[in-house]
């Protein structure tokens, strides 16, 4: 059966790797990059363990360690490179030939009807020649509960060249597997299936296609679209079913790929579709802006964006078809991977030596969880894929700028050092250490937020400093839970018709909160047994009082700003989604 599948499978022509992407003596370069990573890790560890103090002031109980200084410099460098990249992109006006064919693929699973309608409408009005653009929606599910998505597709694209098909299986399951609900272990497509022939015929002859197939996860849905397209299109654009595209999103990404043949993939600026649903969704909207316009912009400066986001990304199809089978059949610790689809796609492009870029000139709005539990499940799912893909990405560091190695090491060790710092200070027998820890966290957060305010030109980014508490109390413990459950998979938060019932991520949060409360209680207990009449303790009490007052005033100010500005003003003005080309310069809440 495998021989037959291999014989009938369409083998795409390998585009090859351009000579200017290949490094001479790759073994030597590997050794250089890995040695740099080891030295970097050793340097960070030594700076942390030795607790070498750069600046101390006993009168104000202040100290700045070498590790803290290094992390501050890292943020400064990241911010600088992000600014340079954004400025370069804004000053460059790339041409578009409008000759390249694009397949806009949408992955859907039990989507909220309102979000799906937004998505399909925006896809319909994308400004790109119709004879060069193909729209494909693949639905993960073929039951009556999933039929509403196909009906909506028919309604939106009524009058266009539409083709639909309800598939009893998918590329990796036959009719027999569909009936008993089992999951096959083979990773090769079943080319003799009649459904495959129908699907590929529809995709290659119709402009707008909707396929309902047996449930198999998001990766199976994306595979169906990619495999059915084959080599008939130049570029493949990815989009989620909860995403509203800017009308020029496709054009702007095509421009980037046309401008540089060494660029294998490009991503755009993803914003939040529902920022004012809750505090969680609002903070996610600020975090998204930072993630794309600072972190990804910095990576783009060095041509090594680590993840092309699923809601808004574009790949060269000839490259994608080369690693399509390997991407779908990815295994980790003997288990097939169903998480991290977008990150692994990006890593596959990077593994071939191609560049990955980010452009803020195209934008999309995507739904984000507004409930804490669903948001936590989403973050846990993303963290699992991050740690797994980090190991894969490390194999190809030597093919790219050394910044990718540096940033990978820093981001990997950061949670562990933060955890150790928090525990060490909480159990250091003095409540001043607790207050100083809280002040340091917020001071660094405010500095980063002030930079974001300047870069975005919007003071609302000052509220981004509140995200540090979400990180410390929620994301940090979830990272350890993600590592322990790294092989557990599923759609996670992607289905929006059902309430998330996975409460397991709450367990590490409970343990972490117990550790934090225990540390605070221990510090208070130890301080209660100290002699506060001594001059040293009187000085500490003085700083403790003013530290607590400053910290309290900060939270009062931020809460007031959030309540008045966001809950009252911005929420009333933001009744519709504003896209990139609809934003007037005078608008306050960008």
From Swiss-Prot:
Pfam families named among the record's database cross-references: Glyco_tranf_2_3
MF (Gene Ontology): hyaluronan synthase activity
Membrane topology field: Multi-pass membrane protein
Topological domain spans for side Extracellular: 53-60, 423-425, 478-505, 565-588
Subcellular localization, as worded in the UniProt entry: Membrane
EC code: 2.4.1.212
Keyword annotations from UniProtKB, A to Z: Glycosyltransferase, Membrane, Transferase, Transmembrane, Transmembrane helix
Its job: Catalyzes the addition of GlcNAc or GlcUA monosaccharides to the nascent hyaluronan polymer. Therefore, it is essential to hyaluronan synthesis a major component of most extracellular matrices that has a structural role in tissues architectures and regulates cell adhesion, migration and differentiation. Also able to catalyze the synthesis of chito-oligosaccharide depending on the substrate.
Record-given protein name: Hyaluronan synthase 1
Species classification: Eukaryota, Metazoa, Chordata, Craniata, Vertebrata
Gene encoding the protein: has1
């Amino acid at each position: 059966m495998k021989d037959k599948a291999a014989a009938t499978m369409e083998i795409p022509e390998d585009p090859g790797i351009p000579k200017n992407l290949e490094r001479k003596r790759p073994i030597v370069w590997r050794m250089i990059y890995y040695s740099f990573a080891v030295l970097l890790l050793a340097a960070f560890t030594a700076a942390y363990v030795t607790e070498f103090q750069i600046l101390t002031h006993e009168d104000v109980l202040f100290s700045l360690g070498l590790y803290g200084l290094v992390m501050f410099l890292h943020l400064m460098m990241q911010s600088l490179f992000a600014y340079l990249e954004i400025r370069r992109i804004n000053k460059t006006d790339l041409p578009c030939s409008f000759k390249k064919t694009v397949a806009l693929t949408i992955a859907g699973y039990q989507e909220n009807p309102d979000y799906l309608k937004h998505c399909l409408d925006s896809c319909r009005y994308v400004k790109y020649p119709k004879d060069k653009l193909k729209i494909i929606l693949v639905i993960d599910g073929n039951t009556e509960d999933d039929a509403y998505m196909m009906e909506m597709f028919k309604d939106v694209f009524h009058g266009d060249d539409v083709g639909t098909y309800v598939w009893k299986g998918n590329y990796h399951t036959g009719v027999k597997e569909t009936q008993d609900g089992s999951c096959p272990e083979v990773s090769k497509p079943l080319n003799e299936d009649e459904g495959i022939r129908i699907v590929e015929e529809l995709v290659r002859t119709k402009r707008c296609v909707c396929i309902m197939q047996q449930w198999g996860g998001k990766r199976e849905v994306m595979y169906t679209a990619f495999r059915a397209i084959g080599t008939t299109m130049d570029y493949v654009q990815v989009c989620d079913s909860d995403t509203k595209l800017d009308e020029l999103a496709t054009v702007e990404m095509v421009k980037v790929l046309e401008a540089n043949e060494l660029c294998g993939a490009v991503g755009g600026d993803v914003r939040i579709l529902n920022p004012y649903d809750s505090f969680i969704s609002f903070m996610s909207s600020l975090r998204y802006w930072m993630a794309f316009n600072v972190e990804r912009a910095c990576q783009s400066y060095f041509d090594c964006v680590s993840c092309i986001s699923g809601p808004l990304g574009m790949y060269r199809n000839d490259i994608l078809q080369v690693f399509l089978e390997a991407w779908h059949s990815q295994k980790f610790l003997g288990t097939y991977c169903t998480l991290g689809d977008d990150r692994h796609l990006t890593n596959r492009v990077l593994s071939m030596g191609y560049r990955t870029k980010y452009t803020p000139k195209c934008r999309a709005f995507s739904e984000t969880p507004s409930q804490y539990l669903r948001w936590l499940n989403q973050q846990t799912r993303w963290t699992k894929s991050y740690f797994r893909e980090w190991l894969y990405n490390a194999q190809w560091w030597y093919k790219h700028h050394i910044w990718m190695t540096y940033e990978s090491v820093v981001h990997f060790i950061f949670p562990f050092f933060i955890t150790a710092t928090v525990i060490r200070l909480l159990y250091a027998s003095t409540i001043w250490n607790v207050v100083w820890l809280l002040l340091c966290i917020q001071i660094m957060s405010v500095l980063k937020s002030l930079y974001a305010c300047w870069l975005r030109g919007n003071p609302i980014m000052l509220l981004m400093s509140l995200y540090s508490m979400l990180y410390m109390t929620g994301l940090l413990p979830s990272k350890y839970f993600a590592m322990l459950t790294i092989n557990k998979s599923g759609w996670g938060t992607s289905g929006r018709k059902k309430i998330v019932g996975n409460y397991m991520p709450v367990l590490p949060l409970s343990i972490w909160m117990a550790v934090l409360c225990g540390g605070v209680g221990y510090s208070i207990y130890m301080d209660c047994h100290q002699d506060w009449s001594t001059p040293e303790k009187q000085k500490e009490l003085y700083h403790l009082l003013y530290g607590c007052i400053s910290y309290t005033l900060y939270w009062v100010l931020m809460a007031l700003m959030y309540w008045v500005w966001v809950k009252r003003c911005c929420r009333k003005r933001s009744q519709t989604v504003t896209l990139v080309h609809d934003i007037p310069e005078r608008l306050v809440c960008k």
